[in-house]
């Protein structure tokens, strides 16, 4: 099962879904609400409860925080795959993992996001949309400009609450994990991802180059790592 990240939707997994289906696997990509880590994780957890095991659970970006929580206590989840993703420990927030060298830390918020209020928001929370120049130059910078522009135009907003909610679980402590790290990721940087992967004891694959959207630009490379996790479950 595949869980997308912020400023994206299930279509970000199109390449992986097609490849895995062609290989004969049952695949689902769930719509991540992008509202609050606790409720987003509960939503994905409820979806997981409808799927027979064994399950390989894959998360991209903020989706990594979601799978870290959603998999907790589910015996059918036998492997976790983090794709340019966050893997928080209990009490940590997704927003703390971009890395000091991330563009999210190097630019002021007003240069990164367009902010919009939304109905039912927790006090102080707003929805964030990545600005066009940030999306094209730093988020999906290895994609053709036409593709990146289309993805920017169709991005799903993420609430600030999603990034500020502390993680309640750390499923990687008990479930084997794999980590796909793009050396060219400017959002959750390779330095930060390597530290999380080492802490989790993950099997690590480093992709030379790419961006935060390597899952779209090079789905075959990401699929290879997902297959490694699948193979471990089948042994």
Task: Show which residues each predicted segment covers.
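Conserved acidic catalytic loop of the alpha/beta-hydrolase fold
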Residues: 39-55
């Amino acid at each position: 099962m595949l869980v997308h990240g912020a400023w994206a939707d299930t279509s970000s997994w199109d390449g992986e879904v097609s490849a895995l289906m062609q290989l004969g696997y049952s695949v689902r990509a769930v719509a991540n609400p992008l509202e609050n880590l606790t409720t987003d994780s509960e939503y994905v957890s409820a979806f997981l409860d409808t799927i027979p095991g064994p399950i390989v659970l894959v998360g991209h970006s903020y989706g990594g925080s979601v799978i870290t929580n959603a998999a907790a206590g589910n015996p059918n989840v036998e492997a976790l795959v983090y794709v340019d993703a966050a893997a928080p420990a209990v009490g940590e927030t997704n927003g703390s993992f971009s890395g000091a060298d991330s563009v999210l830390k190097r630019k002021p918020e007003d240069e990164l996001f367009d902010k919009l209020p939304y109905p039912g928001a927790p006090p102080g929370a707003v929805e964030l949309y990545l600005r066009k120049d940030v999306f094209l130059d730093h988020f999906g910078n290895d994609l053709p400009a036409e593709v990146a522009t289309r993805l920017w135009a169709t991005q799903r907003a993420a609430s600030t609450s999603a990034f500020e909610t502390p993680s309640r679980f750390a499923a990687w402590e008990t479930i084997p994990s794999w980590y796909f790290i793009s050396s060219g990721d400017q959002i959750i940087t390779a330095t930060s991802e390597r530290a999380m992967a080492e802490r989790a004891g993950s099997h690590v694959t480093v992709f030379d180059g790419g961006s935060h959207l390597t899952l779209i630009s090079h789905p075959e490379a990401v699929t290879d790592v997902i297959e490694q996790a699948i193979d471990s479950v089948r042994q």
